[in-house]
A protein has these predicted regions:
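Short beta-strand/loop turn elements enriched in aromatics
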Residues: 119-140, 238-240, 254-265
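His/acidic/aromatic-lined binding-pocket segments of jelly-roll/cupin-type domains
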Residues: 84-85, 93, 109, 115-118, ...
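Transition-metal
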Residues: 1-135, 195-224, 249, 317
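Acidic/His-leaning functional-site neighborhoods
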Residues: 228-291
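An exposed, glycine/acidic-rich loop-and-rim segment of catalytic or binding clefts
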Residues: 146-152, 163-165, 171-222
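Short acidic-glycine-tyrosine-enriched beta hairpin
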Residues: 152-165, 179, 281-299
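Ligand-binding loop in jelly-roll beta-barrel domains
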Residues: 79, 87-92, 101, 122-125, ...
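Short, structured beta-strand/loop micro-motifs enriched in basic residues and often containing a Trp
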Residues: 142-150, 273-277
Length: 317
């Protein structure tokens, strides 16, 4: 019998964090500087545990992935390929870049990080850093060395409902006043190029990674081509945000009794808003805002009755 796998989130404190992961999603926060909820994660820095079904309760997602491959399309990857987060940027994040797989495996011993963002909430005037102005590696290095930050970084205004594809090599930062859902490769490698001269709890400057940034940044900046596809029925809308070699990400806006055929692989689901009933293999499961679960491989349809907004993803590796 196929059952959905519900997970417990791991909360992460950050210098730029706040309290919106509680006010929006009712998570219990470790402090008022909580920046991230790792809601579907098998990364060693924050492993989600299984809430249900009972036979898996308490297991880490990393262990479940290794010991029950049939749930995950018989995948034999070394580790669970994706990581899903909610981020509350009460303050600006450091301006940063992530390496690709080749560079990260050679220098960090883990995979690179391609990611994408769905903007859940944004205060008026909120912005992200997305890209840079340099046309050559020499110009890029010169502007960094001269700390010509305002000339180098490109700011983009954002609003709730926006989506951004952020491949490895992309200079980026989430600005203060923004809450996002992030779908990413299962990696925690970040290279900071600028951090507003902030210090850690001990008063020490947070480390920067200038040479690594110069090594891995895409020059000139390249905006990925996105061809969002929207399919609407009487009871719901499915929006395909991105489909690449790492993942596919969809948004579902459901209002009623809705069903959509799924591919044979497993799917990662987060409820961003609303509540309803999920039906899997004839059994009904209540779902509500902030729930995250995995539909195991072989689940034929996404079948939901209610009024909910979901972000759904699958690994393409």
């Amino acid at each position: 019998m196929t059952k959905p796998i519900f997970l417990n989130a791991v909360l992460q404190e950050k210098i730029w964090g706040g309290i919106k992961l509680h006010t929006l999603f009712n998570f219990t926060l470790p402090s008022d500087k909580t920046g991230e909820a790792w809601i579907i994660s098998a990364h060693p820095n924050g492993i989600s545990t299984i809430k249900s079904p009972a036979e898996f309760a308490g297991l880490g997602l990393d262990e479940l992935y290794k010991t029950h491959p049939k749930l995950f399309n018989e995948q034999q990857l070394a580790s669970f390929p994706l990581l899903i987060k909610l981020l509350d940027a009460s303050d600006d994040l450091s301006i940063q870049v992530h390496p690709d797989d080749e560079y990260a495996l050679e220098h960090e011993g883990e995979y690179g990080k391609n990611e994408c963002w769905y903007v859940v909430q944004a205060e008026p005037g909120a912005k992200i850093v997305y890209g840079h102005t340099a046309m050559t590696p020499e110009e890029f290095a010169e502007k960094i060395d001269n700390e010509a930050w305002s000339d180098l970084f490109t700011e983009v205004p954002v609003k709730a409902g926006d989506f951004f594809d952020v491949p490895s090599g992309t200079i980026h930062a989430i600005g203060g006043g923004i809450v996002i859902l992030e779908t990413q490769q299962n990696s925690d490698t970040t290279y900071r190029v600028y951090d507003y001269n902030r210090t850690d709890d001990a008063g020490n400057p947070r480390p920067l990674h200038i040479q690594q940034t110069k090594d891995v940044t895409t020059i000139p900046h390249s905006v990925p081509t996105t061809n969002q596809q929207v399919v609407t029925t009487d009871t719901g809308t499915r929006t395909t945000f991105v489909e690449n070699k790492f993942f596919t990400v969809w948004k579902y806006d459901i209002n009623g009794d809705y069903s959509d055929a799924l591919s044979s692989t497993y799917h990662l689901v987060t409820v961003l808003d609303g509540k309803g009933t999920l039906t899997v293999d004839g059994t009904q499961y209540p779902i509500q805002k902030a729930d995250s679960f995995i539909l195991p491989s072989g689940t034929p349809t996404l079948q939901i009755n209610g009024s909910v907004q979901l972000i759904v993803s699958q690994s393409n590796q």
